Amino acid sequence: MVLNYIWIAFFVIAFVIAVVKLLFMGDFEVFPAMMDSTFASSKTAFEISLGLTGVLSLWLGIMKIGEKGGVVNALARLLSPVFVRLFPEIPKGHPVTGSIFMNIAANMLGLDNAATPLGLKAMEQLQDLNKKKDTASNPMIMFLVLNTSGLTLIPVSIMVYRAQMGAAQPTDIFVPILLATFFSTLAGIIITSLYQRINLFNLTMLLTLGGACVLVSAIIWGFSQMDKDQVNIVSTTVANILLMLIIIGFILSGVRHKVNVYDAFIEGAKDGFQTAVRIIPYLVAILVGIGVFRASGAMDMLIDGIKWTVAAVGGDTDFVGALPTALMKPLSGSGARGMMVDAMTTYGADSFIGRLSCVFQGSTDTTFYILAVYFGSVGIRYTRHAVACGLLADLAGILSAIAICYMFF
């Protein structure tokens, strides 16, 4: 519903601005430019979708091997000591804990098709424990915030788009996304725990969160000692090594569990073509809307206004061109994806804005969409502090993404 209003606004605002330009500024080129943008954007959307097929097939095949090889179960077992303490109101041994762990693990691996059904199942089980059926319980809210913070280990789709848009090193945003999504998730956990008065000062949580913070701090300190060329070389090398280790690990896990690895890969890869075809209408819709909005001059007005505000308080304005992706992400995943593609098309996949828009896309998730789907599935009407916690986690992800990208790029 939100995306519907945004899409309408793209056209209405663009039309109003174009009429003003025509009548009061004598700009006879604005309407031809807007119409040309609709054709160019439609063509771009189709070409991008077509080009995604091969890389999508590759990674969906690899993910299927990991899924059948028990990687999700292994990750769920690894996470269980931490998440048990984040959900103190859930009775020990209740089946919902398994669904929560599996959902978070699937999200971390980028297995959206598996994560959503597991998430809906977890929400139904949490509703069974909920005493006020129309009001979100504390475990529900913590679960939602963990989903909206966008914690991910493998940002496959973003790397795929970067490859299609001609990035020299599509994986160069891998480490920045890991760092930004860590801060987003950490902020979400801390903020929600403060609301719910969950004690994070126990040995397990201190060791886990403290250890993660030390590791991330060490990574940031290490990169801060290098110049930007060294940062780019090291981060790209590390990202590619990690991704290769993930592929090898998934294959070995499949072999260990006696999975026919080749058949599993083919089964998953088949979904690549279907996924690429399925996103064509969505990508056409959002890119055409953004194209018209940009061709009318409305996007430049928006960005220039934000730049003026940032400059007025003495801030650097290099990041402003990527902000439309960050602002769209809590509202719509497809809308933010369109903004990311538009930024790479306009400024270049290897530009600072192009890279930052990709990190924005990977550091948080679609807060309002997740709230609508998960809470709507069980009839929750009163969300309590869920929206506030989710949006604050998003804000932490956005701010950390900006800081990290200045360091890396």
For each of these PLM feature ranges, what is it?
Residues D36-F39, F46, P95-T97, K132-M140, ...:
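Hydrophobic alpha-helical segments, principally membrane-spanning helices and signal/leader peptides
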Residues A114-A115, A122-R162, A167-R197, L323-F409:
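C-terminal transmembrane helix pair
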Residues M1-G54, A163-R294, A312-V313, H385-F409:
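Signature of multi-pass transmembrane helix bundles
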Residues V2, P91, G98-I100, T135-M140, ...:
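Generic hydrophobic alpha-helical membrane-segment signal
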Residues F101, A105, M140, V231-V234, ...:
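Generic signal for short, ordered secondary-structure residues
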Residues Y5, A33, A45, H94, ...:
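Hydrophobic alpha-helical context, especially transmembrane and signal-peptide helices
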Residues E29-D128, H257-T346:
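Membrane-embedded alpha-helical segments and adjacent helix-loop junctions characteristic
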